[in-house]
Amino acid sequence: MILKNKRMLKIGICVGILGLSITSLEAFTGESLQVEAKEKTGQVKHKNQATHKEFSQLEKKFDARLGVYAIDTGTNQTISYRPNERFAFASTYKALAAGVLLQQNSIDSLNEVITYTKEDLVDYSPVTEKHVDTGMKLGEIAEAAVRSSDNTAGNILFNKIGGPKGYEKALRHMGDRITMSNRFETELNEAIPGDIRDTSTAKAIATNLKAFTVGNALPAEKRKILTEWMKGNATGDKLIRAGIPTDWVVGDKSGAGSYGTRNDIAVVWPPNSAPIIVLISSKDEKEAIYNDQLIAEATKVIVKGS
């Protein structure tokens, strides 16, 4: 999609120069461009309708509610489905909280050793549980939260940025008026339908992730640290990564919760581009089992539609 747009840009520039040089062709050129614009608008509309239908079919296939928001940062074109509906964000917050941590602290501060006790450990803490006696560097804790989805590391991140409300406040300063952050791990994963605590929308998360990874929310050196943590994610191989071409680079953060909640947020680098992809799915039954294949297949729809 990026390369096509670049070619169209070159064609448009050439046509514009030709119109300035040969005024006798002005009316013809203008009419041609108007027709071309209408045709392209129709093509985009048709493509959006097609992807919308495919997402709807995936919902039926997997008995799930799906939220999608993808931004092509080279063209600002988007693909979306239920972009403004709320979903429990689950562990995806860890990537954004790491971004807030980097925003509020110097790189040198990542070497600060943080100590914690056995009582601080919560369920699923595969990294922090090994270092109770010695503590861990702040940067190592952030990396454990993002790469391994370590829940105790996630709580320590929260504590370093003012708790869930401190996290929410930081996002408000970035323009996010949607995300609600209320609880620590592991309660934030309850994902009860209709409960707006610890929820956001696909569009809001995509906008925040774009700001942290390719935007100006962080200076370049800190952006690199965050994206390297995300590229090393060990929990997302069956999600967005499974739905893209093998020569694309992915940095992602997955999440899971009750009611069949399964999320994955990612920044994806195809050759010559850096689009942002956000997928969030949620089932309505508490005992529902999430299906990673839903995320992978939804990603394929995005790739095909881009």
UniProtKB/Swiss-Prot annotation:
Which cysteines does the record link by disulfide bonds?
none
> Record's superkingdom?
Bacteria
Q: Which GO terms describe its biological process?
A: beta-lactam antibiotic catabolic process; response to antibiotic
- What are the positions of the active site? S91, E187
Question: Binding positions for substrate?
Answer: K253, S254, G255
EC number(s) stated in the UniProt entry for this protein: 3.5.2.6
Going by the UniProt record, its keywords in alphabetical order are: Antibiotic resistance, Hydrolase, Signal
Q: Which reaction does it catalyse?
A: a beta-lactam + H2O = a substituted beta-amino acid
Signal peptide region: 1-27
What family does this chain come from, according to its entry? Belongs to the class-A beta-lactamase family.
What PANTHER family does the annotation carry?
BETA-LACTAMASE (PTHR35333), BETA-LACTAMASE-TYPE TRANSPEPTIDASE FOLD CONTAINING PROTEIN (PTHR35333:SF3)
Q: What does this protein do?
A: This protein is a beta-lactamase with a substrate specificity for penicillins.
Cite any additional comment in the entry.
Answer: The class A beta-lactamase family has a specific amino-acid numbering system, sometimes called Ambler or ABL numbering and often misspelt as Amber. A multiple sequence alignment was used to derive a consensus sequence and then the consensus was numbered taking into account insertions and deletions. This allows use of identical numbers, e.g. for active site residues, despite differences in protein length. UniProt always uses natural numbering of residues, hence there appear to be differences in numbering between this entry and some papers.
The name on file for this protein is Beta-lactamase 1
- State the encoding gene: blaY
